[in-house]
Swiss-Prot record:
<dbReference type="GO" id="GO:0010181">
    <property type="term" value="F:FMN binding"/>
</dbReference>
<dbReference type="InterPro" id="IPR003680">
    <property type="entry name" value="Flavodoxin_fold"/>
</dbReference>
<feature type="binding site">
    <location>
        <begin position="16"/>
        <end position="18"/>
    </location>
    <ligand>
        <name>FMN</name>
    </ligand>
</feature>
<dbReference type="InterPro" id="IPR023048">
    <property type="entry name" value="NADH:quinone_OxRdtase_FMN_depd"/>
</dbReference>
<keyword id="KW-0288">FMN</keyword>
<dbReference type="InterPro" id="IPR050104">
    <property type="entry name" value="FMN-dep_NADH:Q_OxRdtase_AzoR1"/>
</dbReference>
<keyword id="KW-0285">Flavoprotein</keyword>
<dbReference type="GO" id="GO:0009055">
    <property type="term" value="F:electron transfer activity"/>
</dbReference>
<comment type="similarity">
    <text>Belongs to the azoreductase type 1 family.</text>
</comment>
<keyword id="KW-0520">NAD</keyword>
<dbReference type="GO" id="GO:0016652">
    <property type="term" value="F:oxidoreductase activity, acting on NAD(P)H as acceptor"/>
</dbReference>
<comment type="function">
    <text>Quinone reductase that provides resistance to thiol-specific stress caused by electrophilic quinones.</text>
</comment>
<comment type="subunit">
    <text>Homodimer.</text>
</comment>
<comment type="function">
    <text>Also exhibits azoreductase activity. Catalyzes the reductive cleavage of the azo bond in aromatic azo compounds to the corresponding amines.</text>
</comment>
<feature type="binding site">
    <location>
        <begin position="85"/>
        <end position="88"/>
    </location>
    <ligand>
        <name>FMN</name>
    </ligand>
</feature>
<dbReference type="Pfam" id="PF02525">
    <property type="entry name" value="Flavodoxin_2"/>
</dbReference>
<protein>
    <recommendedName>
        <fullName>FMN-dependent NADH:quinone oxidoreductase 2</fullName>
        <ecNumber>1.6.5.-</ecNumber>
        <ecNumber>1.7.1.17</ecNumber>
    </recommendedName>
</protein>
Amino acid sequence: MRVLYITANPKLIHHSVSLSLGELALQYYRELNPSHITDRLDLTTEEYPHLNSDTLSNFMNPHSNLATQSKIFKDYDKYIIVAPMWNLTVPSALKAYLDTVIIPNVLFRYTEQGTCEGLCGGKMIYIGARGGDYSHPPQSEYAFDDKYMEGIAKMIGLESYQSYVANAVGGYRRRSVAQWVEHAKYDIEQMVTSF
């Protein structure tokens, strides 16, 4: 079993709720599955281009670097993706990465009816953190991070999607990063156990 652990946050771990929760999830996963291979991808240190005329011209080329990156992504069985919510969605580094690896006829295909059919198996966990409290309407209508990641998981055909999102990490719930980790331990452990 191969797991890709993706982060998209430039903060240091002890200053980041999402990164700290992600590390907790990865620690639990490794304890439960010591023989599984886990690889890390830090999108704040790796450069993935935003879509432009050059990248789009290679989008359908099965021999392009994009296709190679897409096939590498597909070779994993499980994905743990960790990111904060910025401006109502995922950071642009994560969006750019997904835009460059989610390629038609590698991770999904269009059916004759025009719908997407995923070509991946596998599972995904998304761990996020939001500065404000977006857990209830009307704010929940504007939180697109978790919705976006779930949509991506469904589009590429993943069999399972789970998420844990900490709300109000910068707002009225004045907790330290360590307190957030303590607060989330049980939920993260349960999520990873079924992953």
